[in-house]
Swiss-Prot record:
PANTHER family: 30S RIBOSOMAL PROTEIN S18 (PTHR13479), SMALL RIBOSOMAL SUBUNIT PROTEIN BS18M (PTHR13479:SF40). It is found in: Plastid, Chloroplast. It comes from the Eukaryota. This is Small ribosomal subunit protein bS18c. Belongs to the bacterial ribosomal protein bS18 family. GO terms for cellular component: chloroplast; chloroplast envelope; chloroplast stroma; plastid; ribonucleoprotein complex; ribosome. Keywords: Chloroplast, Plastid, Ribonucleoprotein, Ribosomal protein, RNA-binding, rRNA-binding. The keyword Zinc-finger does not apply. Gene3D superfamilies: Ribosomal protein S18 (4.10.640.10). Pfam families: Ribosomal_S18 (PF01084).
Length: 101
């Protein structure tokens, strides 16, 4: 390969292959909360297949298991805890409001 072509070739970078999120021994089941909770967002939504890096068959089984756990009240449908937390509010000033008598 001559020098002019060598300038445009990219060097191959080594990359570390990620471990699969579901090992062969793991059983996808609605009772296996430690496994299911890895595939749910903070809001309680089911994460997509691309984010989870699982196969189509595994994603289908995960989705079914999560839905079963929700129906059986093992998982919440929504996880909006921020909605119920009260933030520190500023004290109301009553001097701005004047009532007409």
């Amino acid at each position: 390969m001559n020098k002019s072509k060598r300038l445009f070739t990219k060097s191959k970078r080594s990359f570390r292959r990620r471990l699969p999120p579901i090992q062969s021994g793991d059983r996808i089941d609605y009772r296996n909360m430690s496994l299911i909770s890895r595939f749910i967002s903070e809001q309680g939504k089911i994460l997509s297949r691309r984010v989870n890096r699982v196969t189509l068959k595994q994603q289908r089984l995960i989705t079914i298991a999560i839905k079963q756990a929700r129906i059986l009240s093992l998982l919440p449908f929504l996880n909006n805890q921020k909605q119920f937390e009260r933030s520190e509010s500023t004290p109301r000033t009553t001097s701005l409001r004047t009532r007409k008598k």
